Amino acid sequence: MERKNVESLFAHAGAINALVIGDLMLDQYLWGKAERISPEAPVQVVDVTREEIRIGGAGNVANNLVALGCRVSVASVVGGDENGTILLHAFSGKGIDVTGIVEDPSRTTSRKTRVLASNQQIVRIDRESRDEIGPDNERRIVDYLNAHGDRFNVILVSDYLKGVLTPTLLAEVIAFARKREIPVVVDPKGSDYAKYRGATVLTPNRKEAEAASGIAIRDDESLCRAGERLLETADLTALVITRSEEGMSLFLRGGQVVHIPTYAREVFDVTGAGDTVLAVLGMALAGGVGFADGARLANVAAGVAVGKVGTSTVSPAEIVGSLGFQHGEGDAKVKNLDVLAGIIAAEKAQGKRVVFTNGCFDLLHVGHVKYLQKARSFGDLLVLGLNSDASIRRLKGEKRPLIGQEERAHILAALDCIDYVVVFDEDTPLNLIETLRPAVLVKGGDYTLDGVVGREVVESYGGRVELVAFVDGRSTTNIIEKILKAYGEE
């Protein structure tokens, strides 16, 4: 899949309305140091230094979709307890529609507590209900689907065998979706895949595929037999088997098989990687992407996810950046404004502080680099607005720039301190600032606050302006004069 198509998918993610149905849970992480053995028993003692609560299970799928820029609704059942309240508040805070979540006082909201030291899990403690939700709760979810379901572009089913996804509810959801040609993407659990019959695509891992097919996967031949059996058992259009360090394999009706190698650079934790695969594949299908390209995109996202500890989300920037890593593209950071606006919106949804600066950057020198490094220190990512060739000619005369905009953008994108480069053709970056709405606007020390274009815009929504001093004696003009003095007569 070409990068421009991936960028277009993310740029239009806001048009995708996704419904996530499944088992919700809280993931609690206790981080600490394990440097002692207990005198009471031969076990490690963990001195807890930090605690964190994240949304897990189907909730992590929803969080991933939000991070990708989609509109998201969730249908599920939680207990009438503190953990259920935490989940509902967390979703609402992210703009996730919780109308389809049923509160049942007789149930316990799932909470998994993981104890970690040196980024490794030591023990996990579970508190949860595993009983089926019952006919009344099934009917309430189906009623929600009948009332609101026509607005969804895709339905993602996240099954953790905690009782929400009963055979009755699954049959109702799949029948509803098939009637309306809405794709249903399922992350399955258990060995009975007949309950998912009629879904569009399933995404089991290798161990799950073995259990469901009854075939031990030892080589490509046994893998293909397992895939074909599951396609038939569940009457699927497609099947994606994730294979850890071996990537994933896509099976389509008619015997077509596509093997996709992994792109994970380093694996810290596989927790939640399946949620990321489900979210990205579902988003891709909703956005009109085919199964093969959707699986490749999900594979890239999974490679990013396993490089993080615990349940986490993956941003469009990380996915596009990984595509650039795979393809060896040095200009993966260079975006047009439409694409960049979608990416930045998703980054902000994850709480990232965006810094913006702009300039010509003709003949890059150490003063530029130090300035950009300082600008990057004010936030989590730096966007550079780069004056186009035409813009520079209007500002500095027909002899400038010395280096064209494509080369300048490529050179600047190679700097670690720069996350994105966007070329603009106007005389000022005001349109960029109004569109991207950075938290911090940075300009050189030769400006006064009153002279900074976009200052009023940034300050109007609580942002700020930072002025950074230049390195004395370092400028493009000085370099040009030095070259002319040394070589002008030759």
Curated annotation (Swiss-Prot):
The keyword Nucleotide-binding applies. NCBIfam families: cyt_tran_rel, rfaE_dom_I, rfaE_dom_II. Residues 1-330 are annotated as: Ribokinase. It is an enzyme of class 2 (transferase). GO terms for molecular function: ATP binding; heptose 7-phosphate kinase activity; heptose-1-phosphate adenylyltransferase activity; phosphotransferase activity, alcohol group as acceptor. It comes from Geobacter sulfurreducens (strain ATCC 51573 / DSM 12127 / PCA). GO terms for biological process: ADP-L-glycero-beta-D-manno-heptose biosynthetic process. Keywords: ATP-binding, Carbohydrate metabolism, Kinase, Multifunctional enzyme, Nucleotide-binding, Nucleotidyltransferase, Transferase. Homodimer. GO terms for cellular component: cytosol. Pathway: Nucleotide-sugar biosynthesis; ADP-L-glycero-beta-D-manno-heptose biosynthesis; ADP-L-glycero-beta-D-manno-heptose from D-glycero-beta-D-manno-heptose 7-phosphate: step 1/4; Nucleotide-sugar biosynthesis; ADP-L-glycero-beta-D-manno-heptose biosynthesis; ADP-L-glycero-beta-D-manno-heptose from D-glycero-beta-D-manno-heptose 7-phosphate: step 3/4. Its EC number is 2.7.1.167, 2.7.7.70. The active site is at 275. Residues 356-490 are annotated as: Cytidylyltransferase. This is Bifunctional protein HldE. Gene3D superfamilies: 3.40.1190.20, HUPs. Pfam families: CTP_transf_like, PfkB. The gene is hldE. In the N-terminal section; belongs to the carbohydrate kinase PfkB family. In the C-terminal section; belongs to the cytidylyltransferase family. It catalyses: D-glycero-beta-D-manno-heptose 7-phosphate + ATP = D-glycero-beta-D-manno-heptose 1,7-bisphosphate + ADP + H(+); D-glycero-beta-D-manno-heptose 1-phosphate + ATP + H(+) = ADP-D-glycero-beta-D-manno-heptose + diphosphate.
